[in-house]
């Protein structure tokens, strides 16, 4: 077969056997063991007048017990390469029988590692014949080849590959003894002469093994596992009835690949195919015709995927004969190494020529490659990725968008300005269906690289277990009302930008200008893009962004004001429709001059700052804010269900049932917990400020009286055991004198004075012992608890509604976050009983009752003891003894009143009732006959009024 430059061939030689008989030196391959030798089938002589006949005559003098087993299927060929070439193998007695030492499938091992036994004559003769015949045949072939010189460099690469494999495989375990039966092991000895000009790293081939299988009952399968260790390559073939050989040669020239130690590659090629059913097994003879080509090395130039697909050429042919298994196993392979000064290529062949079966369909090759990327410094993200098996060394494809991943090496890009804390190893696993379509699957750990630009790229998110995410990079420039940069900022609602707010102010409402130092439009756009995950896919977001993109900015002229929803202390709320859409919004309009005269501008600024930082399902969403004609407008979410005060008035008894009350106050409790974690004390909790969404869930609104303060999260360890938890000690029958006939809680036990009506079977049964608390539950309750409660906040402001004011606010002693738990108790009382607990004839009497009057519960309606106990512990006049003052909402959620409530899935709970969706008058206001009647806003006295015109 003709050779060509840049490739390595394995061809058949017809005269190899005849040339080997002139050999005069004998050596032995130290493979296998004498114990396994006895279990192999005897080799029968077959070639009279040839070198094989002489060898078989010598073999007959050696007693070999034939194996009674009759093996079906193809034999297991073990092909091993040695680092020594041109010299005979050691015939030390310590290596006796090493040729038949079984090796594990997929685990290479050095042939020199094995038990110390004596060498047999048969092994010495076999090694002699193979080495001398290979040497002479190689010399003859090279003398006839005129184009031998172009193949020198390729042969050197293969030879150096062998040496590295042998060096690295010395410490690997071997094959179990029972797997070593019926093995035919063939040794290849390449030349060891390496020219000084060669720059390739020592490389090796792994062991080629073929294990016999049940060839009749099971389909033939071939699995090829290529190990590329370091910068070398190797071959390991594991097959059942079929063999597939792929040779991978890599050049390690300077600049073509990464530096040494860049990573390990493991490529698995799985092929499933079925042999034709008409094939009849005659003998376990396999002929392998291997066409070995070298893959192009990793270089700066791009390599076409078609060339890479053509670079791996593999073929396997399995021959079979009628079942004459008693003859045993026979296979030969000759290797022809050159002399010490000559350069030759590896030649592997089998001497039998058997008719070939029908060609099989082309098999699908699956490659699995493992790469390693090392972060070498704090200014570099990763080093170059060695992608010699991919279409291009500097380009990868993303799995989702199939876009190119830009190279992160320092040669093509300047160092990033983002500093990284530590240097980490980055491991990338790529699963490829073919060489032409590499796909990135997972990046285990990496540091985040903040790069500038507006192009789409694949970056890595900064997390403990990072994954590849598609991210559209946005320009850091502020929103200017026009340009592509603004469009990109608005079009990316899940941006990874982070925003910090100063929470250092404790008692001032106007000290938040530092958090809004940027323009209000820009600051809002950043929040609307990055901090609205639960509302990012809302249609109203898309409508607002579309109007901003179309007109450059958003103003009051883009809304149709439909009707007035309510009037507050600093502004009026209107129902509005965005022009050209069917989206309804609630717009809070505030007159800046009016606020300045009343000195309420800090309250408006505080509310705007709080709304920007909120992102909670039970808190309002701020879609936009703008100033138009001296009017400050806040575009918020519209709740068609009205407020909780109106909804309570619609009930038959003017109050909610206990399950409905538990539903509403649980969501309010979560909203207050979120606000306290942000350092916001609400201070104005009442039913009028609790709106009902269209899905029946609540939304807390109106933050103009809220106080922003510092919050220090702390870990508190539980000091009392779970069975003595103060939040759970309260119960109708927690004491021995348990008489509470009005308790209607189903979970309560029967009162002591009630008659016991038990059946006969129940009387005979032994009383069950109370279940001990679960160990896991005890451990969970004993774990440290995170508390983010602004316990140190203090304010002397007299704010709030009279009926909901806490005693400490009325006394002027200063108040903190505990005022929210007082108002929470008043709200719970009002929802259950339909009125507040301390209401008087006028405001003065109301304030007096709050400070001096004791808490009383009316006789009707009937309320459970748990609800009363919770109200009693919340309405403690001493703020330090009030429930929630120490641990906040976490302490209240553990109360028996909320027992059985799934706090994590409360959004999935069915609300008590859904609001009535009524016509808001949008059709009349926007009809052509009405000429798009708008509402005019103007300040009259102390109120804001909108008039039709």
Swiss-Prot record:
Residues 407-420, 495-512 have a biased composition (Polar residues). Gene3D superfamilies: Phosphorylase Kinase, domain 1 (3.30.200.20), Transferase(Phosphotransferase) domain 1 (1.10.510.10). The keyword Transport does not apply. Residues 79-116, 323-344, 407-426, 495-525 are annotated as: Disordered. Coiled coil: none annotated. GO terms for molecular function: ATP binding; kinase activity; protein kinase binding; protein serine kinase activity; protein serine/threonine kinase activity. The keyword ATP-binding applies. Residues 559-898 form the Protein kinase domain. Residues 81-94, 513-525 have a biased composition (Low complexity). Keywords: ATP-binding, Kinase, Nucleotide-binding, Serine/threonine-protein kinase, Transferase. ATP binds at residues 565-573, 588. It comes from the Eukaryota. It catalyses: L-seryl-[protein] + ATP = O-phospho-L-seryl-[protein] + ADP + H(+); L-threonyl-[protein] + ATP = O-phospho-L-threonyl-[protein] + ADP + H(+). Pfam families: Pkinase. It is an enzyme of class 2 (transferase). Interacts with KCBP, PERK8, PERK9, PERK10 and PERK13. This is Serine/threonine-protein kinase KIPK2.
